[in-house]
């Protein structure tokens, strides 16, 4: 989450006239993430999150995301239910940009996940995959494997500026991923951005909720697991924590056992997931607006993860 669009008190009051939430009592920006402008909103009727959609989020995709949040909440999954306007719409407009209000979810994210957190996060991810079954909305993964080479072609110079010689290494990775990418895996609704800052825990360390579904799409469940392994199971020194990874997979399989083909595919999926986040961080590196309350994330963190995955992971003995 982040803040790119500033909202005045007068603009907020006019916007809230479209909702049955009472008068605003408190309002502040949330300076995390890189995608949208997010605000913590407190009104006479409770606490909420107001999001103004920016950058990569396409307006035509927003009904998919918001309807999915409602679908998940209706099925008992702890996701932020969208709040409808007085006319029943979940999508509105603020400062000429799409905007929505969702429920505030209790819980806290963790900066240094333990193996126990990883186990809980894994189970929460499997719960999400099961709760999403049957969701009628459809959205292709526009940051999936087919998008990586075109995206890199736009940012080759940035890669060389970061690390001379890196573009040739990435070219080789992309060629190998294209040849080795698994097909025909079980698919459905995935989160695609299930990072520690998008998962909340209760005070006792139990899974509480998942947030920030704005990369959600239809893709392989095991790819979502691979994204999560990369996000949760690397140490600050760049080493892969196999204990945390096995805990995460154990938690996932408490609710949804992985099939043999999914287990076999995980190492190459993890390499591809590292490529995806390297490339989007590379794209963000030179394009974050000046003055935004957020710093772009380091692409080289995911280049180092790519280097680990080139050696191959042994996740299942």
Curated annotation (Swiss-Prot):
Pathway involvement of the protein, from the record: Amino-acid biosynthesis; L-threonine biosynthesis; L-threonine from L-aspartate: step 4/5
Catalytic activity: L-homoserine + ATP = O-phospho-L-homoserine + ADP + H(+)
Gene Ontology biological-process entries: threonine biosynthetic process
Matching CDD domains: HomoserineK_II
EC number(s) from the headed UniProt entry: 2.7.1.39
A GO MF term: homoserine kinase activity
SUPFAM superfamilies: Protein kinase-like (PK-like)
Keywords from the named record: Amino-acid biosynthesis, ATP-binding, Kinase, Nucleotide-binding, Threonine biosynthesis, Transferase
Enzyme class label: transferase
Pfam families linked: APH
InterPro entries membership: Aminoglycoside_PTrfase, Homoserine_kinase_II, Kinase-like_dom_sf, Pseudomonas-type_ThrB
The family this protein is said to belong to: Belongs to the pseudomonas-type ThrB family.
HAMAP family, per database record: Homoser_kinase_2
Protein name: Homoserine kinase
Taxonomic lineage from the root: Bacteria, Pseudomonadati, Pseudomonadota, Alphaproteobacteria, Caulobacterales
